[in-house]
Amino acid sequence: MIAFPNAKINLGLHVIARRSDGYHDIETIFCPIDLCDILEIVSATQTKFIQSGIPMDCKVSNNLVMKAYQLLKKHYNLPEITIHLRKNIPIGAGLGGGSSDASFMLYLLSNLANLCLSIEELEAYAKQLGSDCPFFIRNKPVFAKGIGNIFTPIELDLKKYNLALVTTNIHISTSEAYTNIVVSHTPRESLTDIIHYPVDKWKNRLVNDFEEDIFPLYPEIREIKQELYNQGAIYASMSGSGSSVYGLFKKPYRPIGTFNFSIHNFI
């Protein structure tokens, strides 16, 4: 069985408060895009994990795909399998690739073992793997709050836009990004209101709070965002806590010059 776990971007990100448990409350919009990993599982005599594509610097046991397998194996009689994950979604780029892999793994295992898990059951298991993992079960635009784990579906159609995605060799861990974040207590417009403005009104309104702290540390990320605007982007932003940057362009978009980015669509 094979699946294509897709990435997501954040449209805006407000850090609302620092929590007593060390986490932060946030507000953001998750939106799925068509940049995908490839995940395949087949029955085998012994469980084995094979990874290709973008290198992953973690133990196999720490990979979210393996954690998804072990989680369901505690509750169901799963077969031994060979897992092949080809990573195309950059790691530490704010695109949710690992979370997507884990959620799609739950889908595949449910189908392979005829578990017939409902959407709600899949979401409950995904929640145990990561705060944003349940998003990839329904894979539709949502307003996310809490620690990025409380979702409200929203109507958002961006299919008439191309998304230009720029990834870098900079790896920004989520914990690193939150270390220096300054929580703003200034009243501001809700993301759920801003998102319904015309896209050409988003610039300087739809803000990612991490940019203020990340850009001085990694000025090349700021330069990428500006270059996307120079190329004619209607809106550009860093995704999540970085380091990827995206720009929205009206279709059909044809890149100017030699600026290096990939073109994607919204799902």
From Swiss-Prot:
PANTHER family: 4-DIPHOSPHOCYTIDYL-2-C-METHYL-D-ERYTHRITOL KINASE, CHLOROPLASTIC (PTHR43527:SF2). It catalyses: 4-CDP-2-C-methyl-D-erythritol + ATP = 4-CDP-2-C-methyl-D-erythritol 2-phosphate + ADP + H(+). InterPro entries: GHMP_kinase_C_dom, GHMP_kinase_C_sf, GHMP_kinase_N_dom, IspE, Ribosomal_Su5_D2-typ_SF, Ribsml_uS5_D2-typ_fold_subgr. Its EC number is 2.7.1.148. Gene3D superfamilies: 3.30.230.10, GHMP kinase, C-terminal domain. The active site is at K8, D132. Catalyzes the phosphorylation of the position 2 hydroxy group of 4-diphosphocytidyl-2C-methyl-D-erythritol. Pathway: Isoprenoid biosynthesis; isopentenyl diphosphate biosynthesis via DXP pathway; isopentenyl diphosphate from 1-deoxy-D-xylulose 5-phosphate: step 3/6. Keywords: ATP-binding, Isoprene biosynthesis, Kinase, Nucleotide-binding, Transferase. This is 4-diphosphocytidyl-2-C-methyl-D-erythritol kinase. HAMAP family: IspE. ATP binds at P90, I91, G92, A93, G94, L95, G96, G97, G98, S99, S100. Pfam families: GHMP_kinases_C, GHMP_kinases_N. GO terms for biological process: isopentenyl diphosphate biosynthetic process, methylerythritol 4-phosphate pathway; terpenoid biosynthetic process. GO terms for molecular function: 4-(cytidine 5'-diphospho)-2-C-methyl-D-erythritol kinase activity; ATP binding. Belongs to the GHMP kinase family. IspE subfamily. The keyword ATP-binding applies.
